[in-house]
Amino acid sequence: MKMNSPRRIRNNRAKWLLGFFLTVMVILIGRLAYVQIFDHARYVALAKNEVEKNEELYSPRGTIYDRNGNQLAISVMVKSLYCDPATLNKQKNINKIEMAEILSPILNISEEELLKKFSQEGRFVWIKRLMEPEEALKVEELLKSKDWERFLGFREESKRYYPNGRLLANVIGFVGVDDKALDGLELYLGDILKRSKEANSVRMRIDAKGNPIMESALTPYKSKGENSVYLTIDQTIQFYAERALDRAMTKTKAQGGIIIVMDPKTGEILALGNRPTYDPNHFEKAVEKDFKNKAITDIYEPGSTFKPIIAAAALDAGTYSTETVWHDPGKIWASGHAIRNWDDGAYGDVKLVDIIKYSINTGFAHIGLLTGGKTLTEYALKFGFGKPTGIELPGEGAGILFNPDDMRDIDVATMSIGQSIAVTPLQMLQAYSSLANGGQMVKPHILRTVNNPDGSVNKVYETEYVGNPVSKKVADEVKDMMEKEVSEGGGINARVPGYHMGGKTGTAQKIDPVKGGYLENEYIASFCGFGPTEDPRAICLVVLDNPRGVYYGGQVAAPVFKETMGQIMRYMGIPAMEEKRISSAGAGVYNNDNLPALPGKDQKAFLLPNFYGWSIREVGEWLYKAGLGFQPDGNGSADSQSPGAGETVQRGDNIRVHFSDS
């Protein structure tokens, strides 16, 4: 066999190696050509990602408007101050301590904190975000005069601004740094008001440690625009409501207060105010309790404002009628416990209108026991109690109802006078919409429309009916009796001259959240009503938490209703009705049907009715039968009195009434 020579073997090996290297070179050249020609853009982008990163600038959120287009929350561009510590620390002629001393009073940041920021590693650190214009202007002048522009600079950021300050603050909420919504509608509407985070990004170069380099902000992506939201709130009505609430807070020194106004036909919330409150432009100065929207989150015992619901339930269930006469003995027993009237008095023979008008506890306990706990609970659920209304706000409470299987007679009796249950203020408003609206109940809502960036309407929030708890006949009957409560009964201080109003006062002891039971000498005073009763256009609920001194709802909450509703009637352009007087001309016969029921024989203290328009004979006869003294002044019809209507008097007190022919 022929053997290969050593030279031949070496030549073959050399050829093989040469071929191998040529093949590798062809592959490498081909790959390089592919990268340079066909995949160039991808590798450039990858390279840029090693030295650049996305940085969120948080461009403007959408605007929140009231129903009439008034701005409630807007975004404005403001300056934020940053520093390049690496460049600063290379400056031999810059005294950082002196810089801190100069900037500290302007920025309201301690010198120690500033020096700490100046000494950080890297090329970028925030000094102060979202500066006030005056601050930025002063610092800008310093940068130029002190030649600090090499290491200090500004970046524009979006800041939320609330033009009306405290107005509607607990509802709107607020936005913190980094565009983070922290409460209220701002939180609830986050995804609607800010459609895309990418639209608000910028590219920044970074150093070896990943820190952004301060001068490297590149062109931001063009914002696609944001949605805007229109609320059902009317800014003018909101102002009226909050002003009346503030006056009551000052006068009564209450710990807190709530006022809500709603259209009973549509469920649109026209005003919603809370006290305490805060300025969302300076939310950092507030404390935790100031942020709370108690109108939807907190529960309370409604007291006598719940009694019209009980009356409606009994009438609709057929367990009681408007013509039923019941004799009030002043005390009624349930499960071994006595239920008494607020004044410890007895009212004698009374009909349902009297039981409502004079808020007779024994009467409602009697009605509740006749109707039964299971039936009352079923109606309470129909009226929307025990579950959230579903309004477009975060943190809504559900309230508390009895399990009817566990109810004793005392539970039924106390529920019938608005105790031993817990409701939210918004639930009360929703329930009253049924009584004001012919039995039809509407769901409260606060959003009206969501609009696209071009202004076109994206979504409309329609009126939503949530059942008919009672018939139209029953709702109208209760509404008429609630009008008597305002015109003649304990709600006299809610009367709006020229308009017929219906409503109910409420006074309830505060629940002890720690020990259970009730807090001593602490009360919730409230009034809930609507008007004008012929065609209700607004429901208004007023709640005062622990007013000092006088604490009855008819004396401290009803006047807030009166002031607010009076202004609303005029603002809405609803014409006032001519005042109806009881004519004294030729009225030689005393007509008991026209006059409020007399207090019971055993009743020592009671509310004085409104004598406006009564004749001297009518006033004198009523006062005589009530056991009160009479001091008339003038002739004609009564036009003023002392003590005033709705004030508490005792048998034997003298009542001065002035009469005139005008």
Question: Predicted segment positions?
Answer:
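Hydrophobic alpha-helical transmembrane signal-anchor segments
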Residues: M3, R8-R42
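Small/polar-residue-rich segments within soluble enzyme cores
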Residues: E98-P105, K117-E226, V542
